[in-house]
Design a protein with these regions (language model features):
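Low-complexity, highly charged intrinsically disordered N-terminal segments
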Residues: 1-9
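Hinge-like oligomerization/junction regions that interrupt long coiled-coil arms in large cytoskeletal
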Residues: 9, 13-214
Length: 225
């Protein structure tokens, strides 16, 4: 059944090699979904689809490994049950969050409207380059601020201009990620640090979105039997 989606299968293999506890937890969850109130989502790495594959390296750089391996629960009761069964009983080392009561996705507003963003040379915010269930996206906005990190695929952004702009503190231009901080005193002078994006590894398998949708529909049909 996993092979109905090559992307899912390949990312599961990443977890099988790098985080055996998370991989085993996914297998357990697949067999026990019926005990939960709502869907408990597999780790972020498995749930995220790239709607713009050219952003995969940038997205992977923005998502730390702890974030990538995190399970997302929609309710506190499901979080308590999941962690009791797998962390307390089995002593598995897992990252788990619950989103009950967290702020809605719509409240994560970008620092600049799209027209102003494009005028600065950017193509999109990181959040616009991915798709995932709403609660997973809420978690990624909270943990990784994807709604506030713009990306310029061709690297046309001027760092000095961005320092004067001041509303965007972290951005990606070409193969480089920039982070600007401001001093706490006096004229609050800016300081910008940059580093090359991480090599693309875990999100290398981006797949075809139409194929992904067909695979998801097939999985749901099988699960409904």
């Amino acid at each position: 059944m996993e092979r109905l989606s090559t992307v899912r299968y390949q990312r599961l293999q990443v977890l099988a090699r790098a985080d055996r506890d998370a991989y085993e937890a996914i297998q357990w969850l697949q067999k026990n979904r019926g005990v939960f109130e709502k869907c408990v989502y597999d780790p972020v790495l498995v749930m995220v689809d790239m709607t713009r594959p050219e952003a995969a390296r940038a997205i992977e750089t923005c998502l730390s490994w702890p974030v990538q391996r995190t399970f997302v629960c929609q309710t506190r009761a499901d979080y308590d049950l999941f962690t009791h069964e797998l962390i307390d009983k089995r002593q598995w080392r897992l990252n788990v969050v619950e989103m009950e009561g967290a702020q809605p996705l719509e409240s994560y507003t970008p620092p600049l409207p799209e027209a102003e963003l494009r005028a600065l040379g950017f193509d999109a915010y990181a959040l616009q380059c991915i798709d995932a269930p709403t609660d997973v996206l809420r978690y990624l906005c909270s943990a990784a601020h994807l709604h506030a990190i713009p990306i310029a695929f061709e690297g046309r952004v001027n760092p000095e201009h961005m320092e004067r702009q001041r509303q965007i503190r972290r951005y990606i231009s070409g193969d480089t990620i920039f982070t600007t901080t401001f001093s706490n005193y006096g004229q609050r002078r800016p300081q910008t640090m940059s580093r090359v994006l991480k090599p693309l590894r875990n999100l290398a398998h981006v797949g075809d979105m139409a194929e992904r949708e067909r695979a998801t529909a097939s999985l749901r049909a099988l699960q409904a039997l």
